[in-house]
UniProtKB/Swiss-Prot annotation:
Gene behind the chain: rps27e
Cofactor: how bound: Binds 1 zinc ion per subunit.
Any GO BP annotation: translation
Keyword hit for Ribosomal protein: yes
Start-end of C4-type zinc fingers: 21-43
Keyword Zinc attributed: yes
Binding site for Zn(2+): 21, 24, 40, 43
Signal peptide: none
Protein name: Small ribosomal subunit protein eS27
Subunit record text: Part of the 30S ribosomal subunit.
Amino acid sequence: MKAKFKVLIPEPKSKFIRIKCPNCGNEQTVFSHATFPVRCLSCGTQLVYPRGGKAKIVGETVRILG
């Protein structure tokens, strides 16, 4: 008998990221490949700038989810 090959399942490169606002310290979850600018819910500072592919994150990354 021949050994079966392991079936590879592709995984997405994008993730959800928990970031902290540099001005007020508020934490919120954003998408790593965001297509729209994301603002802080407390102070309104822009935290994520869309860049065509992966978004530019201004705040401090606290945790990567998933």
